[in-house]
Amino acid sequence: MGKGRGRHPSRLKVKPPEPEILAKYLHHWNTKELYHHPDTFLQVSSPSFFQNENPLEIDIGCATGDLVCSLAQKNPQVNFIGVEVSMKPLYRAIKYSVREQIENVRFIKTDFRLLYPLLPDASVQKIFFHFPVPVVRAKDSKYLIFSEDFLSEMHRALQVGGMISVISDSAEYFPIMRELGQNDTRYELISDEAKCMALEPDEKSYYHKYWDAQGREKFRFILVKK
């Protein structure tokens, strides 16, 4: 998710929050340690991150946290975790969380794929995968998240009826993801625009708002765990 796309938020000019604030909101996990020793890290779950049993939703590539912070404000009985590889946008997300006194949101700086071993079975209510880097060429394969492996891991981690929300601005990449989802019979595919909109929140991510301002067409589908 770190590949630049338009006005990438990693170029933001923002100072780090105070250490005690970072300690509360941010888990900055070393990728090598996470890859080799995942058992030494916290489980990515509501009990581990929030010390409660509230439903958990995760935003993959959360950027400045616009989506998860807004959702957390609107849904105080749901926990939210934003995952991002770039630090500066997370600084902005954390500062907003502090200013608005949002207690049910946390952030992880790492590659989401490394979190698979840390996601307990049936522990997640919803996954947001909005505006990923389009992976249509071999040289971009290092950015690939949406795959058969991803769908298997998310199926394990999602509760029955849990959802994966996918939105993309790439007419080339979107059909690739949709075909993968459609071929996985463990999920129900919802691709009708009106039905998707009815299931989606009004809140938008950084990229969603950015591409709206550019007038760019967007494509979406939802996968529901059977």
Curated annotation (Swiss-Prot):
Keyword Chloroplast: no
GO molecular function: tRNA (guanine(46)-N7)-methyltransferase activity
Domain of life: Bacteria
Pathway annotation from the record: tRNA modification; N(7)-methylguanine-tRNA biosynthesis
Ranges that cross the membrane: none
Catalytic activity: guanosine(46) in tRNA + S-adenosyl-L-methionine = N(7)-methylguanosine(46) in tRNA + S-adenosyl-L-homocysteine
Residues at which S-adenosyl-L-methionine binds: D59, E84, D111
InterPro entries linked to this entry: SAM-dependent_MTases_sf, tRNA_(Gua-N-7)_MeTrfase_Trmb, tRNA_methyltr_TrmB_bact
Keywords: Methyltransferase, S-adenosyl-L-methionine, Transferase, tRNA processing
The EC number(s) this enzyme carries: 2.1.1.33
Signal sequence annotation: none
Binding site for substrate: D169
Any Pfam family: Methyltransf_4
Family statement: Belongs to the class I-like SAM-binding methyltransferase superfamily. TrmB family.
Protein task: Catalyzes the formation of N(7)-methylguanine at position 46 (m7G46) in tRNA.
Protein's UniProt name: tRNA (guanine-N(7)-)-methyltransferase
Taxonomic source organism: Chloroherpeton thalassium (strain ATCC 35110 / GB-78)
Gene name tied to this protein: trmB
